[in-house]
């Protein structure tokens, strides 16, 4: 539902369907009959936000509670934003059309550090003060979660509370407490102090941060009864976890326009650069029976003809073949294709391939991450060259002719020879295609090589490592391009400038807040979009604020330095991460969790693969 003022703008903007709501399966409630109104804000465009599984789950979860009405808010694209500012139209929610400032909670899911300026811009467009200290009443409570909550410090001055870990349970606990506090006439501070006692809730205003003369952190000091360490929340029984039986079906084409079914959380592998592989430990699976039934309901209620099996590594699902047997038993008849978007090189077997082929072939994507075997050992990828070639040969024999390969440059200990091996590996895949006798005849192979830049992230063994400087990253990108000698390989790479700013925010502290506030004042937004990003403008702001961004991005930390996220516990011990970092420099790999428990600390949750492994050893 949109106002007449908004309607007048729709013919003047790209994709007006982004801004009107009214989609199939949206939830409409009588706002006079609910106690809590939650504006679920995704700090990017409609197409990106509507593709996000976490938003789909929490939107349905909140709205399954009678007294909560959760509505969606997305960042308007530049053309719409300009018109809204000109006509002084505040940011609004799609379902009711009401201004965001009318809501009790303004919640953000933070998937990417470069969305921080969008978060602040959305508050600004809502006429809501960006600083937490300036929002004094028990309304417009700004909350945030998602992987960027691993290090909440750069935006700690703006957010009232962060949800640490998985949100299905803690979110509702906070909503219920809010309802109670408002009925009792409590103030905002009293509400926040009580929220801080809930496991998985971090209230930044209840902590003092002091610094050493060299700019590093001296101490985090909790105020009052705030806990010294905030422990993450997680769902232990995935079969019992909430999952929607329908999704809001978008009016415009979105990035991932299909049904998405989560099959497990966590990852058994432990790639040393991968934040998700550590913060979502331990691995917890859904049963094939539950997954199959949920897929049926989703496809029936949304009309989608593709279902994507979502996880960090779908082929590591322990019952992948029985699951595919169940799915293909009805997907073929219903003309529903099955997508496995996160396949490991060593997980694409003949059996899996044949199951997928019976429905409809979708694209294949693999992530070797490094071109040389030495570098794959450094990052603990545990994938051999011959395995990759055999996997590609299997795919080519099965009728596939396009393969996407994801790599990362700038990793610790990397040399130019390692970088050139990325191009060489792509060439080996091309050669394998023409060496496969039973490939599709009369077709050419297309290999896409994509190289992102290493960004050191919290709660990984590489969290202490420096990022390569921008000139070095550009040199490595050019070296790959020069090393590719065939037009059958397409080379894509991430902009080094944006990766640099991502690294600044990923390992930043509260001193960055003044730079972000100044960026908001100057209308920065969509930093993750290359046509909107201007590094020089950021460097100017950092200089004005007396901040050296290289201090955060390009500096190696010592193991005994207090890190901005050290007061948060994601279940993996710092001692384990240090041990893994040292093993990387010795080119030593660590077995995955099903082969051996490496003692990361996640077994303490009493659930998941690592706990099962330890139980079997007793």
Name each region found by the language model.
Residues 76-222, 461-509, 517-531:
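Glycine-rich beta-alpha loop elements in corrinoid/cobalamin-binding modules
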Residues 9-39, 46-47, 204, 210, ...:
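N-terminal [4Fe-4S]-dependent radical SAM core
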Residues 52, 253-289, 596-617:
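Canonical Radical SAM [4Fe-4S] cluster-binding loop centered on the CxxxCxxC motif
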Residues 195-205, 312-317, 341-347, 410, ...:
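A glycine-rich phosphate-binding loop feature that marks nucleotide/adenosyl-phosphate handling sites
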Residues 41, 45, 296-404, 408-448, ...:
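Conserved SAM/AdoMet-binding glycine-rich loop
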Residues 2-28, 32, 38-40, 485-618:
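Radical SAM enzyme core and accessory elements
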